[in-house]
Amino acid sequence: MQFIHHRINTLEQLDGLNLADGAEVDIRYHLDQLVLHHDAFQLDSQDLLTFESFLSNWQCKGTLILNLKSEGVEDKCIELLQKYKVSNWFFLDMSMPFFVKYALYAKNNDILGFSPENLCARFSDYEPLEYALSFSSMIGWIWVDTFASFPLDLGAYEKIDSKNLKICLVSPELQGQPVINIKLMKAKISNFDIHSVCTKYPELWR
């Protein structure tokens, strides 16, 4: 299983990563730049890391997840990823109109350096698997989130696996659940071939 570190928005955090791991970053448009920051209205322009600076320092072999906090930045993200020769990545949490737009681009190979491998669809206890799988020919990943209950049972896993889609789990602490729930989730997926998990505590997943 690949370990993707949650919310790596500074160079200090990036420097601390195992080079075999991946990272999730939060991307916003601010003062004519793409910057890494999670919370709106709390941006200190003096301390913001630009996405380009992040990419110029990116050496990890794992997947880079781009959690989009602003719309309309997708093309610039792809351009920068191409510039720095980063190919192992995907967009997360696009609004539905933009997701559909870019899913069609991916399916039709309309953008250089952008393919279904760079998109995920969401599946959770609130978001039905059937909806996510309706995009199966346009995406490479299923993002499995857990708000109140873990949705990935054997039936759901087999449906995803039959479409040759990679699974990225959301570790329970990212939704405010107790850290002990990591152990419970690990037990539930012990017989599944899970590609990745996004977590604050990769050491508890290893």
Identify what each model region corresponds to.
Residues 1-206:
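Phosphate-group recognition and catalysis centered on beta-loop-alpha active-site segments
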